[in-house]
Amino acid sequence: MSSALAYMLLVLSISLLNGQSPPGKPEIHKCRSPDKETFTCWWNPGSDGGLPTNYSLTYSKEGEKNTYECPDYKTSGPNSCFFSKQYTSIWKIYIITVNATNEMGSSTSDPLYVDVTYIVEPEPPRNLTLEVKQLKDKKTYLWVKWLPPTITDVKTGWFTMEYEIRLKSEEADEWEIHFTGHQTQFKVFDLYPGQKYLVQTRCKPDHGYWSRWGQEKSIEIPNDFTLKDTTVWIIVAVLSAVICLIMVWAVALKGYSMMTCIFPPVPGPKIKGFDTHLLEKGKSEELLSALGCQDFPPTSDCEDLLVEFLEVDDNEDERLMPSHSKEYPGQGVKPTHLDPDSDSGHGSYDSHSLLSEKCEEPQAYPPAFHIPEITEKPENPEANIPPTPNPQNNTPNCHTDTSKSTTWPLPPGQHTRRSPYHSIADVCKLAGSPGDTLDSFLDKAEENVLKLSEDAGEEEVAVQEGAKSFPSDKQNTSWPPLQEKGPIVYAKPPDYVEIHKVNKDGVLSLLPKQRENHQTENPGVPETSKEYAKVSGVTDNNILVLVPDSRAQNTALLEESAKKVPPSLEQNQSEKDLASFTATSSNCRLQLGRLDYLDPTCFMHSFH
């Protein structure tokens, strides 16, 4: 027994003296899976003890008692073990150990617990691309692009990859690392022009390890950034040169026309009769006169110069035809009644200057001027005013007593109540005819006058003065001397009268219409049957159309009263105007039946 123990100690001492020992303890370096389907484990062997040593990898799965040896020691290289899909399971924990054995003994590494899900280390990104670009502000940058690893399934979402890039200039020692997240492209700014840069990329899954750095690529940043396609600049330059040549040629040939088109001349005044000197001097009144514009009429404060309207009784039974017609209408023709409420231009009455303007200028008048019947009685009618012939002007005044009056212009205090019709502007239009009408007298009385009413009798009085003819070339011819013993009446009353003028007080002065044979009726002895006329209308030639009244009453009394009127004393020129103005409305009225009529010849003499 003691001899056997001594033998063993002798052998051991001899082995130690020769340098042989059991193998050292191996160490598992790492286990990695590129795609969660396969994985590989690497280890570092210990000392071999001077003897040949065998290494083996054994594993077991958690929850299982069986131990398995590595299926493939060659695929991944020496000191490694490759697990194919057949031997790889996810959501399982592997317990892995490495054993070393030689003639002197054996040794075992520490166990390593591996979960395939957390040991993924993908391949580096592929297809790395570098490009230098320029922004609109001429600032350059480096554009880096790459693709995910080929083995990993990124499109289906089996992996979620994150990326990093690193770059440095060729002369630098340290790398500049940029994390890009899940993007596969990145822009690097603030690069130094004229230097060469080195770029690399890598990736890692959401749970795992960073891949190794990929292939290294380099690029040089140019000093002056220029476009690669220089043909674009060449084309632009050629087109610009052609356009410039065309413009120079056009200006050389048609320089004046082009300058006129670009800078047109200032047009001058094209108004006929327009005086530029008046415009430059700034005299607006002379300029308006040159253009034919009327200046503003002067204002007048004399209210008594305006005549409100003319009122003449209208015969509702009979009507004469216009002056150009020589026949009277038939019995079936009815007179046209006027609407008493129609507007007659009352605004003309309110104008202070309309009367003078319209009485001075000849104007075109309406074909007819109808005047409605006014039957309102004055408050203070004048009566029994004897005629006062003026020897200087040979102007008679007639008077007839009546209970009704027709509105005529009076002084401001003697105006009677008037109907709100008939503006004086319309009356002045009738009075604005040329002066050559002074040569006209009473036209030939129409033979086919409507029959007078038998009830009117044959004793109507004509309180009218005969008028002698005026020369056509003189307007201001005096009237013949008047007879002082009584009024002179016509053998046959006149049918037409013509407006002579309108005096400053707005009173109409009438003349008898001249006959066709240029002869006037001479005054003669009144016949047994007399007729008085009333205004029926106004023709185109401003002639009043008169119609005899068939309802004249009490003509005998009127004739007697007219004959008994004594002549008044001689008046001077200023008193004559006032007397003719105030006494016209009462002295020239005749009451025939229940209507009033005016004697045109009386006004003709009084306002001449």
UniProtKB/Swiss-Prot annotation:
Zn(2+) binds at residues 206-207. Its main location: membrane. A motif (Box 1 motif) lies at residues 262-270. A motif (WSXWS motif) lies at residues 210-214. Residues 398-408 have a biased composition (Polar residues). Glycans are attached at residues 54, 99, 127. Disulfide bonds join 31-41, 70-81. One of its GO terms (biological process) is response to bacterium. The keyword Transmembrane applies. GO terms for cellular component: cell surface; membrane. Residues 254-608 are cytoplasmic. Residues 318-327 have a biased composition (Basic and acidic residues). It is found in: Membrane. Residues 20-229 are extracellular. One of its GO terms (molecular function) is peptide hormone binding. It holds the Pfam family EpoR_lig-bind. Residues 317-355, 377-419, 466-487 are annotated as: Disordered. Residues 345-354 have a biased composition (Low complexity). Keywords: Disulfide bond, Glycoprotein, Membrane, Metal-binding, Receptor, Repeat, Signal, Transmembrane, Transmembrane helix, Zinc. SUPFAM superfamilies: Fibronectin type III. The WSXWS motif appears to be necessary for proper protein folding and thereby efficient intracellular transport and cell-surface receptor binding. The box 1 motif is required for JAK interaction and/or activation. Interacts with SMARCA1. Interacts with NEK3 and VAV2 and this interaction is prolactin-dependent. Belongs to the type I cytokine receptor family. Type 1 subfamily. This is Prolactin receptor. The lineage of its organism: Eukaryota, Metazoa, Chordata, Craniata, Vertebrata. The gene is Prlr.
